[in-house]
Amino acid sequence: MERTFLMIKPDAVQRNLIGEIISRIEKKGLKLVGGKFMQVPMELAEKHYSEHEGKPFYDKLISFITSAPVFAMVVEGENAVAVSRKIIGSTNPSEAAPGTIRGDYGLNLGRNIIHGSDSTESAQREVKLWFTSSEIADYKEPREDWLYE
């Protein structure tokens, strides 16, 4: 099974959307295998968003992601990266389809509720950056027999 990294951002945490977001992810068949509620240290934020360093929005992004707690998680399932990206919706909430997390809850590009790895390579890098192997559970849910052929 494929794993991916998701992070419920400060705007969603402050709006009490953690449970709703996790529920949507689980209802789609993805399994939560790691999760932690945390204040993001500056160093971790800079490593996570290193690809954006030097861009006009970088400082604001780092400031935002370290401003309040986030809920970081690892989810697992068949095509987890693609499935989670579809549930999340377009990066810009004004372009996200209704029924997606960002389409329903996102306010603008800077307050877009959730981060999701954009590729299997990014997912592997981000999972390793945010979680140790001991923080990720390896288990089987009874529903898996009903979800996958």
Curated annotation (Swiss-Prot):
InterPro entries xref list: NDK-like_dom, NDK-like_dom_sf, Nucleoside_diP_kinase
Binding site for ATP: 9, 57, 85, 91, 102, 112
Keyword line: ATP-binding, Cytoplasm, Kinase, Magnesium, Metal-binding, Nucleotide metabolism, Nucleotide-binding, Phosphoprotein, Transferase
Domain of life: Bacteria
NCBIfam families xref list: PRK00668.1
Family: Belongs to the NDK family.
Gene3D superfamilies from the UniProt entry: Nucleoside diphosphate kinase-like domain
Catalytic activity of the protein: a 2'-deoxyribonucleoside 5'-diphosphate + ATP = a 2'-deoxyribonucleoside 5'-triphosphate + ADP; a ribonucleoside 5'-diphosphate + ATP = a ribonucleoside 5'-triphosphate + ADP
Role summary: Major role in the synthesis of nucleoside triphosphates other than ATP. The ATP gamma phosphate is transferred to the NDP beta phosphate via a ping-pong mechanism, using a phosphorylated active-site intermediate.
Annotated signal peptide: none
One example GO MF annotation: nucleoside diphosphate kinase activity
EC nos: 2.7.4.6
Top-level class of the enzyme under EC nomenclature: transferase
Cofactor(s) demanded: Mg(2+)
Descriptive protein name: Nucleoside diphosphate kinase
Chief localization: cytoplasm
Active site: 115
Quaternary organization: Homotetramer.
One term under GO cellular component: cytoplasm
GO biological process: CTP biosynthetic process; GTP biosynthetic process; UTP biosynthetic process
Localization of this protein: Cytoplasm
